[in-house]
Amino acid sequence: MRLSTSAIALCVGLLVARGAAAVELPQRWVSAGGALSEWVSALGAQARLVGVDTTSQHPESLKALPSIGYQRQLSAEGILSLSPQILIGTEEMGPPPVLSQIRSAGVQVELFSAQPDLPTLQNTLQRLGRLLGSEAQATALFDGYQQQLVQQQAWVSQAQTTAKAPGVLLLLGHAGGKPLIAGKDTAADWLLQQAGGRNLATHSGYKPFSVESLAGLTPDVLVFSDRALTGDAAREALFKQNPILASTPAAKTGRVLELDPTLLVGGLGPRLPQSLVKLSAGFYPAESAKATAAQ
C-alpha cells in the first residue's frame, strides 16, 4: 500500500515537531532554592545548572557553580550575566521587580510551591520532569520517596507502641544568636511530625525565641539548626547565647540533636527521608537500639 503525499507530510511534520520540542527544552538553568537544585541533580540534570543560590549546598559539587546570592535578594544583573534560559525557585524567590526584569529579558521564570507535603512534592517533580524531558524518571523518584516515608511511618508506629511521642522544639539560628522557633506550616514542623515527634510550638511559621516563649514548655528533645556553625561549636554557641535552654529536660538528659539547615529551605528535598531516620533514632533511642541489635 502506498502512502499519499499528505500522509507522508503529516508523519514528517509530527517527527519534526517532536524533535523541535526536545530541542526547545531549556538547557541553561539557574536555581534559587536548595531543594529544587537537589531535585534537578537527582534527575540527572546537574550539568544544565549554570548558577545557584546560597541555599543550594548539596550535592557538594554545586558549590563550584557561580552564586546568584540569597534567594530572597536576587540581582537581575548577576543572573542575566549567566545567560540562563530558565530560572527556577519557590514563592520565596524575589524580590518581584527583579523577577519581572528577568522575564522581560526573555528568561523563562518558573515558581514552585515550598509547601511541605507530598502532593506539592509530586507536582514539583512532575513539572521538573516535563521541563527536563525526564518525566518517567521524575515519577520513579517520587514513588521511591513515598515508599521511604511509608517505611519510616511503619517504624515510628512500632516505636510508639512502647514509647510516647517526645515533646520537641526546633530552633533555627545563626552562630547561636537570636534563634527562631519553628512552628506549624513549616518544613521543620513536617519533619518533626514525620520523625514521630510532637512539636510543642503552636504558632505558625517561625517566631523569635525568648525566655517568655519557653515558659510552660518542657521539651524532651531540642533540635537545632545553625546557619553559621556545626557540631559542638554550634551546640556550645546555642547554650551560651540562650542559657535558659540549659534548664530544659532535653538539655539535662543530653537529648539535643543537630539538623542541617539546608533541609528546611524550599520544600521537601531528596535528603529528607534519611534525615528522618536519624531524627527518629534520637526521638526513640531505646527502640532504635533494639532495632539495631536485632539486625
Where are these regions (language model features)?
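Short secondary-structure boundary segments
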Residues: G33, E91-E92, A114, S204, ...
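A short, structured surface patch at a secondary-structure boundary
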Residues: Q27-M93, V98
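His/Asp/Glu-enriched short active-site or ligand-binding loop at hydrolase and phosphoryl-transfer sites
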Residues: D53, A182-K207, D226, E258
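Bacterial N-terminal signal peptides that target proteins for export
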Residues: M1-I8
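A ligand-binding cleft/hinge motif common to bilobed small-molecule-binding domains
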Residues: P95-S104, F224-K240
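Extracytoplasmic substrate-binding proteins
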Residues: V23-R28, P97-G176, R198-S204, K252-Q295
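N-terminal signal peptide c-region/cleavage motif recognized by signal peptidases
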Residues: V16-G19
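Short helices/loops that flank or line small-molecule/ion binding pockets
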Residues: A76-S83, S210-T218
